[in-house]
């Protein structure tokens, strides 16, 4: 009788609690649907075969600025060396291994927007970049002064890639 009491009052509730805990844990561990992946606003091929960029965000943000986010994709068999390849030549020393040469062009307003610079004249953009290896991807970003509010589309120019015209500026 004592064995039945143990089963009835201790083991059964313990096993039931354990089962509930395990089932709850399994349910919580199921992958959740995350936010939809970023839409590609524009894409351009590079001078090197198999290398391209995809603009995933161009958006007005606080402080009268615009954030540009893009992905560089290397589907080739050769590495992409950043070095001075993507710099603004007027800032070579501080732009080394950055994308400081990326710019925006408002053709209608005849205005070119350069990457924002900090007090040390460094670009407010992806810096300290390493080589992009074959079959690799790299997320990059840069901050620009915002064009006037009536400018809804702009050209994105990334050195060594075809210009991407009429890229929509989000809010």
What spans do the regions from the language model cover?
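Bacterial N-terminal signal peptides that target proteins for export
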Residues: 3-14
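Bacterial N-terminal signal peptides
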Residues: 13-24
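Signal peptide processing junction and immediate N-terminal pro/mature segment
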Residues: 25-33
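Envelope-exposed proteins and targeting segments
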Residues: 49-51, 64-68, 100, 138-140, ...
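Low-complexity, acidic Ser/Thr/Pro/Gly-rich terminal tails and inter-domain linkers that flank the onset
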Residues: 37-61
